[in-house]
C-alpha cells in the first residue's frame, strides 16, 4: 500500500471521534508522532474530538458547546477516524441489531459531507480493544471479550458492506494480553495505560499510513564490518576492550517503549535494533553522546538490543 492508497494521506486534515480510547490518544502522543513522522514534508493536521464515555447514540456536551459538524467544518476534515464499540458492547448480544443500525446511520450522516469544501470526507472505523484479565478486578473478562469480539465482527462486516476501511484492534490486543510475565496494557481491563497506547499506536499507524521499518544494525567486533538497513556506521574505531562509531539514521527513529522499556517479545520488531557479534565474554556498556544507555552481556549484545 502506498501513501496515495492509504486511509490517511500526507497533508490530510484528520479528525478522531469516539470514546475514551480516542479521547486519551491526546494524552499519549505515540500515534500522532508516528503519523507526523510518516507525513513529513506534507504533514497531517490532527484534531481529536474524542470524549470519554461517547457512544454512537450518546454524546453529552456542555450547553453551547460547538457541534461536531461545525468543528469538522472548521478543521476542514478530509478523513474521520471513528473509535466506537466498547461502550455499546455492554448491551451484549441483544444490542447488536441496534448497534448495526447506529453504525449505518453514522456512516450515512457523514459520507457525502464535504467538510473540507472540496471532496466527500473519508471514513475509517476502529474497533475496541480486548478486555484484559486482571484477576479478581475483572471477574467477567471472558464474557466481556465474547461481547467485544461480536461487536468487532459486526463493525468489520458493516465496513466491508459499505466500502469503508476497518481497523481491528481487538484481535491484536487479545493476543498481547495472553502473554505471561509481560507488561499489562490497561489500568482497569478496558482503559489503556501508557504502555498499552504505545503498543496499539504502532498497529493503528501501520493501518492508517504505513511507514518505514525500524532500522537494524549488526556490527562484527572481530572484523569491524557492519550490515543492516535504515542506518549506517562511519568513523569506526576498534580496540581490544572498546569500540566507537557514529550511527547515521536514514529514517525516523522508532518510538522507545515507556517505563523500563520492557516489551512483549513479538513487539521487539517495532524497535530499532543494534547487535554486536563476536565480543569477548563479559558485560559491555553502550554510551551515546557521553550518556550510558544500556549495559548487557556479550550474549545479549549478540542477540541484539532495541
Question: What function would you assign to each model-found segment?
Answer:
Residues 9, 26, 184, 188-306:
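Conserved catalytic region of serine esterases and O-acyltransferases that act on ester linkages
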Residues 109-121, 154-166, 207:
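A structural motif corresponding to the C-terminal end of an alpha-helix
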Amino acid at each position: 500500500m502506498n501513501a496515495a492508497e492509504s486511509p490517511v494521506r500526507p497533508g490530510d486534515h484528520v479528525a478522531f471521534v469516539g470514546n475514551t480510547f480516542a479521547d486519551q490518544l491526546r494524552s499519549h502522543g505515540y500515534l500522532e508522532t508516528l503519523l507526523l513522522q510518516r507525513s513529513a514534508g506534507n504533514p497531517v493536521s490532527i484534531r481529536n474530538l474524542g470524549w470519554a464515555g461517547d457512544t454512537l447514540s450518546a454524546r453529552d456536551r456542555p450547553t453551547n458547546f460547538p457541534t461536531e459538524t461545525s468543528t469538522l467544518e472548521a478543521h476542514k476534515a478530509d478523513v474521520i477516524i471513528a473509535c466506537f464499540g466498547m461502550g455499546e458492547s455492554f448491551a451484549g448480544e441483544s444490542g447488536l441489531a441496534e448497534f448495526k443500525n447506529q453504525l449505518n446511520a453514522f456512516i450515512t450522516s457523514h459520507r457525502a459531507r464535504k467538510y473540507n469544501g472540496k471532496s466527500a470526507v473519508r471514513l475509517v472505523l476502529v474497533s475496541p480493544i480486548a478486555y484484559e484479565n486482571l484477576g479478581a478486578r475483572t471477574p467477567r473478562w471472558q464474557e466481556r471479550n465474547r461481547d467485544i469480539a461480536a461487536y468487532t465482527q459486526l463493525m468489520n462486516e458493516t465496513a466491508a458492506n459499505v466500502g469503508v476501511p476497518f481497523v481491528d484492534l481487538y484481535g491484536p490486543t487479545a493476543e498481547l494480553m495472553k502473554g505471561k510475565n509481560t507488561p499489562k496494557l490497561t489500568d482497569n481491563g478496558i482503559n489503556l495505560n501508557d504502555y498499552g497506547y504505545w503498543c496499539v499506536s504502532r498497529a493503528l499507524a501501520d493501518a492508517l499510513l504505513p511507514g518505514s521499518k525500524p532500522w537494524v544494525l549488526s556490527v562484527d567486533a572481530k572484523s569491524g564490518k557492519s550490515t543492516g538497513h535504515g542506518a549506517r556506521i562511519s568513523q569506526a574505531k576498534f580496540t581490544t576492550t572498546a569500540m566507537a562509531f557514529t550511527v547515521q539514521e536514514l529514517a525516523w527513529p522508532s518510538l522507545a517503549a515507556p517505563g523500563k522499556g520492557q516489551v512483549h517479545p513479538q513487539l521487539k520488531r517495532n524497535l530499532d535494533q543494534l547487535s554486536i557479534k563476536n565480543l569477548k565474554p563479559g558485560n559491555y556498556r553502550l554510551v551515546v553522546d557521553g550518556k550510558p544507555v544500556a549495559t548487557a552481556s556479550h550474549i545479549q549484545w549478540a542477540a541484539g538490543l532495541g
